[in-house]
Amino acid sequence: MNPPAAFLAGRQNIGSEVEISTIEKQRKELQLLIGELKDRDKELNDMVAVHQQQLLSWEEDRQKVLTLEERCSKLEGELHKRTEIIRSLTKKVKALESNQMECQTALQKTQLQLQEMAQKATHSSLLSEDLEARNETLSNTLVELSAQVGQLQAREQALTTMIKLKDKDIIEAVNHIADCSGKFKMLEHALRDAKMAETCIVKEKQDYKQKLKALKIEVNKLKEDLNEKTTENNEQREEIIRLKQEKSCLHDELLFTVEREKRKDELLNIAKSKQERTNSELHNLRQIYVKQQSDLQFLNFNVENSQELIQMYDSKMEESKALDSSRDMCLSDLENNHPKVDIKREKNQKSLFKDQKFEAMLVQQNRSDKSSCDECKEKKQQIDTVFGEKSVITLSSIFTKDLVEKHNLPWSLGGKTQIEPENKITLCKIHTKSPKCHGTGVQNEGKQPSETPTLSDEKQWHDVSVYLGLTNCPSSKHPEKLDVECQDQMERSEISCCQKNEACLGESGMCDSKCCHPSNFIIEAPGHMSDVEWMSIFKPSKMQRIVRLKSGCTCSESICGTQHDSPASELIAIQDSHSLGSSKSALREDETESSSNKKNSPTSLLIYKDAPAFNEKASIVLPSQDDFSPTSKLQRLLAESRQMVTDLELSTLLPISHENLTGSATNKSEVPEESAQKNTFVSY
């Protein structure tokens, strides 16, 4: 066994041990971070409960303060009135004191007079006792006389009524007698002339007597009718008084009802004004939330840009060191195969290598999908002419202004956005030469450049896998085993790695398949959001984001010297949440088949079955969130703002449609099943 081969094998073992140790450390860190996140969630929940209690106590204190202020204002008014009363009373007291002094002098005089009067009072008391005895006797007599007077008055009233009735009868009789006397006189004057008509006059007399009797009977009846009508009038007066009282009561009730309606209208106006204020505050908070989201995204981009630029710088330094070490080790082989290589050529190679890196970065920023593989071919030809048999590894992650502008766009512009970055660069690894084609020297040259930059490649691959959620993917752990890998780093970083050997010109294969190209990935985001959807966002839920292929991935090529296939696996990055209504309709239109077993599973495991010739399985486990983000403080602030918005919306009692929430649980993440690749979903 050659010494460089043993050295390379030792380095591979060291690299695998380093990988295992780093993976274990990362797992421990992940577990610690998950524990910390759970503790912070508990603390946040406790803080929210305490905050709600404080708000309730603040409202109660505020009401108490308002009542106390009203009482204070009333008491101050009463104090002012009483102070004025006290002042007036003090003036009166002073006047009374002066009067009291005068009264004391008068008292002394009156006391002397009282002594004199007391003697007189003793005499008068004796007289008064005698007079009281007389008064008692007189009072008894007065009582008896008053009783007799009452009886006499009653008799007098009865007699007066009888006299009045008799007077009326007498008056009527007098009138009738006067008439009769006149008639008798006339008859006396006419007797002489009409003795013959006596019979007729007698008859008329009898008729008049009968009429008198009838008239007397009618008068008695009319008196009885008058008495009945007076009693009826008294009853009607009592009813009128009672109706007036009822009318006053009804009028008071009407006034009370009018006042109640006025107060209800005032309360409604107050409630409307409060609703408008809360709506305006909600609108402002939503704008603040959108601004914070955009700022957070921009900061995330800046952080990731800085991290990846640092990684680029470290990888370049490691590449330069690795190239120096590989050149020192391969000098003997190069001299045996190509003795005409000069030191000037190596210097030119260094300068051209650096220039071509920056040219490749600029070219890849401005080219589209179709020119990606052609670009790799052109670079391959240039490297063949310039470098000879030296292998070149270029690893670059490019961040452009277009990506930043795309991420700054608000999510609410469309229900489903298909993000196709302009900087579409595929990761292509060219075949190394198998040991059957050439000799041992060429074999060593092919192994050295493929194994020296393992550390830098692993770091880059690990960063890409963390961003895509592929930390547990076996392909991300061993990128050097695959010949062709066409992967995207979702919208942010894209890696191009072209590995080439001069001796293996006949069997070099390029990644011409377009199934794993970034244009075939669709990233679905929430669209226009209503009030109900704002509620579902502001609740502490998780966001769903799906990256999937437009069509089945068919890119797979064989490796010279190692019997392994690199089947293109579908990348699905899932961040768990209840998806919004606008994004659900877009999901249903694009995805034709969905598995019924994935309704309640928070994460999904995609197992891809390879061709039956090799019976190899590649499983990709996708984590829900990126736990390595350095912007935890901003995320906490966002969570607090979300909680505040939910509290406000719950206080305004906005309607929450349960249908959207239940529908989001059923239509979570859907993945098409392809019979050719035999994909199976395992939910856990």
From Swiss-Prot:
Superkingdom, taxonomy of origin: Eukaryota
Disease listed for this protein: Spermatogenic failure 67: An autosomal recessive male infertility disorder characterized by globozoospermia. Affected individuals have a normal sperm count, but spermatozoa are round-headed and lack the acrosome. In addition to pure globozoospermia, some patients have a mixture of acrosomeless spermatozoa and spermatozoa with small or detached acrosomes, which is defined as acrosomal hypoplasia.
Bias-annotated ranges (Polar residues): 594-603, 659-669
Disulfide bond keyword on record: no
UniProt tissue specificity: Highly expressed in adult testis. Expressed in both prostate epithelial and stromal cells, with predominant expression in epithelial cells (at protein level). Not detected in prostate by RT-PCR. Overexpressed in various cancers.
Disordered, as annotated region: 579-603, 657-684
Protein name as annotated: Coiled-coil domain-containing protein 62
Domains as described in the record: Contains 2 Leu-Xaa-Xaa-Leu-Leu (LXXLL) motifs. The first one is essential for the association with ESR1 and ESR2.
Assembly behavior: Interacts with ESR1 and ESR2 in the presence of estradiol/E2. The interaction with ESR2 recruits CCDC62 to ER target genes, including cyclin-D1/CCND1 AP-1 promoter. Interacts with GOPC.
Gene this chain is encoded by: CCDC62
GO biological processes: blastocyst hatching; cellular response to estradiol stimulus; estrogen receptor signaling pathway; positive regulation of transcription by RNA polymerase II; spermatid development
Cellular compartments annotated: Cytoplasm; Nucleus; Cytoplasmic vesicle, Secretory vesicle, Acrosome
Upper classification of the organism: Eukaryota, Metazoa, Chordata, Craniata, Vertebrata
Function: Nuclear receptor coactivator that can enhance preferentially estrogen receptors ESR1 and ESR2 transactivation. Also modulates progesterone/PGR, glucocorticoid/NR3C1 and androgen/AR receptors transactivation, although at lower level; little effect on vitamin D receptor/VDR. Required for normal spermiogenesis. It probably plays a role in acrosome formation.
Keyword list, A-Z: Coiled coil, Cytoplasm, Cytoplasmic vesicle, Disease variant, Nucleus, Repeat
GO MF term set: nuclear estrogen receptor binding; transcription coactivator activity
Motif (LXXLL motif 2): 650-654
Motif interval(s): LXXLL motif 1: 634-638
Coiled coil: 11-160, 199-322
Any one GO cellular component localisation term in the record: microtubule organizing center
